[in-house]
């Protein structure tokens, strides 16, 4: 709530005004932006606030009760690196609170791992980095993630892998990563990157640390651009379904806050 002070003559009145619900986007590095997620939130008129709290032990977050939803983006750190990045602990606490209250929450890559570990899943190093385009297989369907094709080739960029939280619904997997997407309550986690559009990919490939990872995994900038051009059109329907659905859930949740 915000306080609005009005004055008529010598009389002053203080009125409690409901703040506009926002979707909180937690970003860990400048180039891991929300891309298509943000576009879908803006398309239906939702306000967003983007913060990077990884280095803050006690981050000054917006009032949780006034949030319409939460997005946790990717980054190069480990989901449990609390000593080096104390803000990740606050993000895990936020994830648990969102699920407990039914508030929509979406995690991508590191965000997927933060949500899963916050809900009790185990984190470990993958057998090898999964970087570039590779297929995922559908395991189950849900309105949050309606992958109609049995297999899709998506963009990956991670070293760690996470298990499935108890009571979580496994939605997709790959040959090297058993949990590529899952749902638990109001949470959706995706290990891969549906949010990346062409301009965001260019930002990734301008970032030296990303290029270093790509080359170490045997890839190249030209190859990745060619693969993006090949697969992106096939991925757009799923990206639209996932992110417009998340935006709609945030919008519905915002309406409950305004009552």
Segment roles from a protein language model:
Residues 3, 13-14:
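Short, positively charged and aromatic/hydrophobic N-terminal segments
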Residues 19-24:
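Extreme N-terminal starter segment of soluble prokaryotic enzymes
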Residues 25-30:
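N-terminal, positively charged, Ser/Thr/Ala/Gly-biased leader segments
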Residues 32-36:
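Short N-terminal binding/cap micro-motifs at the start of the first secondary-structure element
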Residues 38-106:
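Flexible gly/pro-rich beta->alpha loop and the following alpha-helix that scaffold active-site loops
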Residues 98-122:
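Catalytic nucleophile loop
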Residues 119-200:
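Pocket-forming structural segment of enzyme catalytic cores
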Residues 196-259:
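Acyltransferase
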């Amino acid at each position: 709530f915000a306080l609005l002070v009005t004055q008529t003559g010598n009389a002053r009145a203080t009125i409690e005004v409901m703040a506009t619900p926002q979707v909180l986007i937690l970003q860990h590095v400048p180039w891991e932006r929300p891309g298509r997620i943000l576009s879908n939130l803006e398309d239906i008129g939702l306000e967003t606030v983007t913060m990077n709290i990884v280095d803050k032990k006690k981050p000054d977050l917006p009032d949780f009760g006034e949030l319409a939803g939460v997005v946790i983006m990717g980054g190069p750190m480990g989901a449990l690196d609390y000593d080096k990045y104390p803000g990740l602990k606050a993000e895990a606490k936020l994830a648990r609170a969102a699920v407990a209250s039914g508030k929509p929450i979406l995690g991508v890559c590191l965000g997927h791992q933060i949500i899963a570990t916050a809900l009790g899943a185990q984190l470990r190093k993958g057998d090898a980095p999964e970087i570039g385009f590779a297929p995922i297989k559908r395991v189950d369907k849900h309105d949050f993630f309606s992958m109609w094709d049995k297999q899709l080739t998506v963009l990956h960029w991670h070293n760690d892998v996470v298990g499935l939280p108890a009571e979580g619904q496994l939605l997709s997997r790959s040959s090297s990563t058993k949990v590529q997407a899952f749902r638990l309550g109001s949470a959706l986690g995706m290990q891969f990157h549906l949010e990346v559009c062409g301009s965001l990919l260019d930002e990734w490939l301008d970032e030296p640390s990303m290029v270093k990872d790509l080359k170490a995994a045997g890839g190249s900038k030209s190859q990745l651009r060619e693969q993006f051009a090949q697969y992106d059109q096939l991925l757009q329907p799923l990206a639209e379904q996932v992110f417009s659905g998340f935006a709609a859930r945030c919008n519905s949740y915002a309406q409950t806050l305004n009552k």
